[in-house]
Amino acid sequence: MSLQLSNSLFFARKESHFRCFSHVSASLDTGVRRVTSAKIASTCFEETKERIADLIHKAELSVSTYDTAWVAMVPSPNSSQEPCFPDCLSWLLQNQCCDGSWACPHHHPLLKKDVLCSTLACVLALKKWGVGEEKINRGVHFIEHNFASAMEKCQISPMGFDIIFPAMLDYARDLLLNLRLEPTMLNDLIYKRGLELKRNQNHSAEREAYLAYVAEGMGKLQDLGSVMKHQRRNGSLFNSPSTTAAAFIAFPNSRCLTYLRSALKKFGSAVPAVYPLDIYLQLCTVDNLERLGISRYFQKEIQGVLDETYRCWLQGNEEIFMDAPTCALAFRVLRKNGYNVTSDPITKLLEECFSSSFCGNIKDINTTLGLYRASEFILYPDERDLEKQNLMLKNLLEQELSSDFIHSSQLGRNIDAEVKHALEYPFYADLDRIVNRRNIEHYNFDNTRILKTSYCSPNFGNKDFLFLSVKDYNECQAIHREELRELERWVIENRLDELRFARQKCAYCYFSAAATLFAPELSNARMSWAKNGVLTTVVDDFFDLGGSVEELKNLIQLVELWDVDVSTECSSQNVQIIFSALKCTICDIGDKGSKLQERSITNHIIDIWLDLLYSMMKETEWARDKYIPTMDEYISNAYVSFALGPIVLPALYLVGPKLSEEMVHHSEYHNLYKLMSTCGRLLNDIRGCERELKEGKLNAIPLYIINNGGEITKEAAASEMKSLIETHRRELLRLVLEGKNSVLPKSCKELFWHMSKVLHLFYSKDDGFTSQDLIKVVKAVIYEPIVLK
């Protein structure tokens, strides 16, 4: 981890970087440039990737003048009259701002309390050792002229400000530092400190921890046992240089000194606000890249970070397990990427957080949101504690949203909208490209975070991330628009638009592919997914509305025979159009897949379609005979008739990895398909219950009531179906993420999860393709480029 003084330096390591960013931003607004401009843009693109790759390997963090000042106050263990770290004093003398303060240049205007605290700490350090009188006077002048900010409610209060700042003013008096402050405001500050101390002195573990964290504001009120019980293996208290320095000043301790020396050995003559923070910073980078849709460019670098994080997880590293945001992020990112991590540490941490207002600063809504997102990743039936905590965190977020004031440790972040979306659309109903676009459009340039003082890091976010993600999104989208035009031509060429009974859902079918399989190299998989989506819609409508029993049987017979003369063997024009489109499309996908797989796959695709046709025919016969199946009979047929097989299964052959005959006949393959399809069928049945009852169709809700003797309500039946969906969805995700005993390649398994997310989104509000919200996201993913303003 390296230090930077100014957050502006994070983005200006190369002057050409700004020129590149500015140039390409303009090009996104005005269209494709000439060849020369394209070359420049390409060079800039590659340079940006290199900078991000470098950033993944390291962690950069801003200097904390506040923490450096407290370290500078530490006396030598050999003489209380000499500083232990004179280099820190020299750094303070060299880094005062022109206005007399000690603050990062270009700091946020709402951080005046932070600047006051940092400046006062620096003045105290210089005064304590009797150096820099002129610097002290300028600092005092700044404090006196900006003192009113300490009482302004609109200003952001760093953690512990009401305790620490008044205590430092007391210390200033002890050092005979003459501060001419407005008496009424000073008394108000002292009164607030008294109230804060009284509120926290109830001897509970969480309050004790909080007061230990703000040790520099406790002075003689500190208790040795209460403070030092929080010392970590590295010698620090809470990985905070300022807390550790204050604790050492009050209670000299060799391990505290070892920690401070190690920090200065790593960073030189100034320290950050938190150390170590490498794991969290690197995970933030990985999470940023994933959420912006550009992680595929850095797979090797990300793999290195994840492997190292997993090693630290298994070792019980305190940097992970003693910090709520880091633990939550590590759990979510590792589990999401298939690492075998138990939920025990996260549930234990959450238990402590719910019994503690301090642990991990859970009152910060960013921490709460991070914990909520982690708690969503429930994979196993025995993770009941995690499930309960997920509901508690959800309630906590809802309460925060309804309150007048939301405390956030991150500046410039549209946290209200982020929380609302997380509550409305859980991760299993949020499609990748929708997530990417939302994160790009609401991207937060201000990478400042706030604890006892503000700090910033390019790992939290920077312009390189935004530039690369916008360029990637728009370039992929241009490919997607062309593919959709190709799909529309295919519909006309195959005369599918002539089938008046059939819904025309071309854009929606393509959207479900583009929103999940968005990389340019997955074009064949997208087109297979979309074309088969259109065809399954047509066939479904043919069985429901457009075809007679004779026509349906004829269609099945044609697919069984395959090599037939359509001019003589088709019983109607509708059958001819449908079969011809099916055959043409299956052969095309089969040819492309066979080249990639180096074996023939066409017969397997035909079999997949026959399974669908047989299941649809069975439902037709049940309806004709007025047969009421058992629940088991219904599900065993309905998951196939839901028609996801022809959409997902052929596409597996086109995403890259080789799939052997053994793989596609393995139980894992079938389980993934059945779990995905059952979720989809039950989601459809819950949302479409009223409509399907009116149409005389079979539906899981009334069938479940009938199979239970009619003794349960429709609401109870729907609740049971939702529980079944949840169980199947979690099992599906577990199989997708499982690597150790898996037969199928992960990139193939992910298609089942992608489709599951599509279904959960499509059925989140309305019955299928009817939601206005869905129309908006289709436009956003396929038609509307992102324009940087």
Curated annotation (Swiss-Prot):
Keywords: Chloroplast, Lyase, Magnesium, Membrane, Metal-binding, Plastid, Transmembrane, Transmembrane helix. Its cofactor is Mg(2+). The keyword Metal-binding applies. It is found in: Plastid, Chloroplast membrane. It comes from the Eukaryota. Its EC number is 4.2.3.19. It catalyses: ent-copalyl diphosphate = ent-kaur-16-ene + diphosphate. GO terms for biological process: gibberellin biosynthetic process. The keyword Magnesium applies. The chain crosses the membrane at residues 638-656. Belongs to the terpene synthase family. This is Ent-kaurene synthase TSP4, chloroplastic. It comes from Vitex agnus-castus.
